[in-house]
Amino acid sequence: MKKYFLKCGYFLVCFCLPLIVFANPKTDNERFFIRLSQAPLAQTLEQLAFQQDVNLVIGDILENKISLKLNNIDMPRLLQIIAKSKHLTLNKDDGIYYLNGSQSGKGQVAGNLTTNEPHLVSHTVKLHFAKASELMKSLTTGSGSLLSPAGSITFDDRSNLLVIQDEPRSVQNIKKLIAEMDKPIEQIAIEARIVTITDESLKELGVRWGIFNPTENARRVAGSLTGNSFENIADNLNVNFATTTTPAGSIALQVAKINGRLLDLELSALERENNVEIIASPRLLTTNKKSASIKQGTEIPYIVSNTRNDTQSVEFREAVLGLEVTPHISKDNNILLDLLVSQNSPGSRVAYGQNEVVSIDKQEINTQVFAKDGETIVLGGVFHDTITKSEDKVPLLGDIPVIKRLFSKESERHQKRELVIFVTPHILKAGETLEALKQKSEGKK
């Protein structure tokens, strides 16, 4: 930015200079700083036009003098300010500025020049679906704001109104954008079934984890992503585990996809055979990119001592089975699910000073998976070992102390169960319910 310090005496050497008009100016938008003190107006503008390469024709403006101090100004803006303050007429034609005395006694600026005070209009927009405060934040933040420097937007939460004050063109652009953004958001219903199931029963449901020969619809992750036998796992999952092995009783992420059309019936049948224990069947309803969660469990109290004032307080830690889902709908109606599954349970008692505290055994899965509308994602990897002891004996004879072993048989059954979460997302249109959607899908099949 250039600086010009012009005094009245400086122009004594410029009075004999003729008026210079350049046919091909370089630019008239270069910004500069200027300070004038009782300077002759015509000679000052003539010298500035010469230094700025601006085409300027000055009419009979008498012997006006001017004092001013302006920062970060360009030549067109300077001419507008002078025309307004000295009641002159400013026009621009074919790249040439014309500055003349005003016959009406008021400063006039031609329509093809920006005025000092822009014309602002006010407009209110009633929102039907979007929240006024959130939409206003989207319109005013960031480098892509549609507001002009003189514009403003306010909102009224009670009536869910946006009040826009800006130049007419900016108001029209903002109204078009609001119309695109104020639309009903698609809802996503998340069906989850949290069960413990044997490995044999899981295979009966059609789940194949693909431990050594992963297929298109089955993936298994144990530890880091780099040590697995398939190459495109990073395109399907976003997982970070600290361990690199999966011993018995540990947690390893397993993801698969199955046809969930008859899943409820099959799980109920397996439950009657005591091969499945259905822990919970939560249903979550949320909107695009909004989190939904459900927890089931208990809170364990802990005594916390404050050494400063020698007081004690009670704090609680959660030991729950929890599911948190954040869906993202793509343009082709595929759904990216951010899943956080936690299985936290009270652990062993640990001596702490003169008291005992209960530890919390934590197992968590945090991953991203893609699913189609209505497709069932299966998450597993939390294992539980159960040992069942039983005794078969002949009545009466099996109770005689000396000979009872001849007429009885003891057996021990070792069973490995896995905590499995079935997650099925459904995209609901406006006014649609999950029950109506499922009936519609079953009718098509």
UniProtKB/Swiss-Prot annotation:
Keywords: Cell outer membrane, Competence, Membrane, Signal, Transport. The keyword Signal applies. The keyword Transport applies. GO terms for cellular component: cell outer membrane. Gene3D superfamilies: 3.30.1370.120, 3.30.1370.130. One of its GO terms (biological process) is protein secretion. Residues 1-23 form the signal peptide. It is found in: Cell outer membrane. Involved in transformation (genetic competence for DNA uptake). This is Competence protein E. It comes from Haemophilus influenzae (strain ATCC 51907 / DSM 11121 / KW20 / Rd). The gene is comE.
